[in-house]
């Protein structure tokens, strides 16, 4: 049977003076007392456990938030430290790079100066060698020219210059005359006669 059929059957049974919606007083007292006992039991046993669980969960959440904030602060501090180290490393790298450039320029200048000194030394040695070679060639040419001049003078004058001192003096005078004419003096010394 359904609830509707039960209500209809109760209405037909003849209890028309009672109100169905208002319970009897004994049931009302038992229901109220049961509800009061249930509420008292709730406040005495269940509410402290719920409050304790709620406090623990709140504490756990707040602790988790505090730990998360602490971890975030620590991560931020590590990030700042990393950024500072990175900036320091960049500054150090720039300083090292500048020192390397400076040392490179200094080494280049030193090598350039050493090369210039070496070039100057080589040039000085070459100039000295050229001067020595020139002096040797000039002396050799003078000697050969003197010998040719003595031979020529002997043939022109018709007699042999026998004295080597006379030959040497004649050669020296002739070369001096050639030097003077080369310098633009224009005077040629008179040839030395044999015997004076």
Curated annotation (Swiss-Prot):
GO MF assignments: proton-transporting ATP synthase activity, rotational mechanism; proton-transporting ATPase activity, rotational mechanism
Membrane association type: Single-pass membrane protein
Transmembrane annotation, as ranges: 24-44
InterPro entries: ATP_synth_B-like_membr_sf, ATP_synth_b/b'su_bac/chlpt, ATP_synth_F0_bsu_bac, ATP_synthase_B_chain
Segment forming the signal sequence: none
One GO term describing the cellular component: proton-transporting ATP synthase complex
Annotated localization: Cell membrane
Major localization listed first in the record, in broad terms: membrane
Assigned keywords, A-Z: ATP synthesis, Cell membrane, CF(0), Hydrogen ion transport, Ion transport, Membrane, Transmembrane, Transmembrane helix, Transport
HAMAP family named among the record's database cross-references: ATP_synth_b_bprime (MF_01398)
Function: F(1)F(0) ATP synthase produces ATP from ADP in the presence of a proton or sodium gradient. F-type ATPases consist of two structural domains, F(1) containing the extramembraneous catalytic core and F(0) containing the membrane proton channel, linked together by a central stalk and a peripheral stalk. During catalysis, ATP synthesis in the catalytic domain of F(1) is coupled via a rotary mechanism of the central stalk subunits to proton translocation.
UniProt-listed NCBIfam families: ATP_synt_b, PRK05759.1-3
The family this protein is said to belong to: Belongs to the ATPase B chain family.
Assembly information from the UniProt record: F-type ATPases have 2 components, F(1) - the catalytic core - and F(0) - the membrane proton channel. F(1) has five subunits: alpha(3), beta(3), gamma(1), delta(1), epsilon(1). F(0) has three main subunits: a(1), b(2) and c(10-14). The alpha and beta chains form an alternating ring which encloses part of the gamma chain. F(1) is attached to F(0) by a central stalk formed by the gamma and epsilon chains, while a peripheral stalk is formed by the delta and b chains.
Protein name (Swiss-Prot/TrEMBL): ATP synthase subunit b
Species of provenance: Frankia casuarinae (strain DSM 45818 / CECT 9043 / HFP020203 / CcI3)
Lineage: Bacteria, Bacillati, Actinomycetota, Actinomycetes, Frankiales
